[in-house]
Swiss-Prot record:
Glycosites: T23, N111
Pfam families: IL2 (PF00715)
Known role: Cytokine produced by activated CD4-positive helper T-cells and to a lesser extend activated CD8-positive T-cells and natural killer (NK) cells that plays pivotal roles in the immune response and tolerance. Binds to a receptor complex composed of either the high-affinity trimeric IL-2R (IL2RA/CD25, IL2RB/CD122 and IL2RG/CD132) or the low-affinity dimeric IL-2R (IL2RB and IL2RG). Interaction with the receptor leads to oligomerization and conformation changes in the IL-2R subunits resulting in downstream signaling starting with phosphorylation of JAK1 and JAK3.
This protein's name: Interleukin-2
GO terms under biological process: activated T cell proliferation; adaptive immune response; cell surface receptor signaling pathway via STAT; extrinsic apoptotic signaling pathway in absence of ligand; interleukin-2-mediated signaling pathway; leukocyte activation involved in immune response; negative regulation of B cell apoptotic process; negative regulation of inflammatory response
Location, primary (coarse class): secreted
Phylogenetic placement of the source organism: Eukaryota, Metazoa, Chordata, Craniata, Vertebrata
Keywords per UniProt: Adaptive immunity, Cytokine, Disulfide bond, Glycoprotein, Growth factor, Immunity, Secreted, Signal
Source species of the chain: Oryctolagus cuniculus
InterPro entries in the record: 4_helix_cytokine-like_core (IPR009079), IL-2 (IPR000779), IL-2_CS (IPR030477)
Gene3D superfamilies given in the database record: 1.20.1250.10
Subcellular location: Secreted
C-alpha cells in the first residue's frame, strides 16, 4: 500500500520537475524579451534626450523611485510600479498638441514584456533613492544589458 503512494509521489515530483525545468527555447524567449525591453527603454531615453532644453529641464524635476538592488528578473516589479508615473511625465512633456502614440506604445510594450519576464511572483520593492527620468531609464537599460550579457556568456 505504501509502495503505491511512494511511486505516485515520485511520479508527481518528476512531473513537476520536468514541467518547471528551463528549456533552451524558454531561454531564447527570455533573451528576445530582454532585447525588446532594452529597445523600448532606449526608444524612451532617445525621446527624452531629443526634447528641447526647457522641456527636458521640466522633466528632470520629476523623480522616480529606484530600488536598492536590481540584479534579477523579479526586480522588474519595481520598473512596472513606476511605468504609470513615467508615462504621465512623458505625456506632459509632449504637450496637448502632439500625439503620445509612440510613448503609449513603448510603455505598453514595456508593461507586457515586464509581466512576461518577471512571472507571477509578487516582489516587494525596497526603494533606495529617487532619480531623474534620464538616470531611471539609464539604470534599467544597464540592468537589461547586464542580464543579456550574463545569459549569453
Amino acid at each position: 500500500m505504501y509502495k503505491v503512494q511512494l511511486l505516485s509521489c515520485i511520479a508527481l515530483t518528476l512531473a513537476l520537475l520536468t514541467s518547471s525545468a528551463p528549456t533552451s527555447s524558454s531561454t531564447k524567449e527570455t533573451q528576445e524579451q530582454l532585447d525588446q525591453l532594452l529597445l523600448d527603454l532606449q526608444v524612451l531615453l532617445k525621446g527624452v534626450n531629443d526634447y528641447k532644453n526647457s522641456k527636458l529641464s521640466r522633466m528632470l524635476t520629476f523623480k522616480f523611485y529606484m530600488p536598492k538592488k536590481v540584479t534579477e528578473l523579479k526586480h522588474l516589479q519595481c520598473l512596472e510600479e513606476e511605468l504609470k508615473p513615467l508615462e504621465e511625465v512623458l505625456n506632459l512633456a509632449q504637450g496637448k498638441n502632439s500625439h503620445g502614440g509612440n510613448t503609449r506604445e513603448s510603455i505598453s510594450n514595456i508593461n507586457v514584456t515586464v509581466l512576461k519576464l518577471k512571472g507571477s511572483e509578487t516582489f516587494m520593492c525596497e526603494y533606495d533613492e529617487t532619480v531623474t527620468i534620464v538616470e531611471f531609464l539609464n539604470r534599467w537599460i544597464t540592468f537589461c544589458q547586464s542580464i543579456i550579457s550574463a545569459s549569453s556568456s
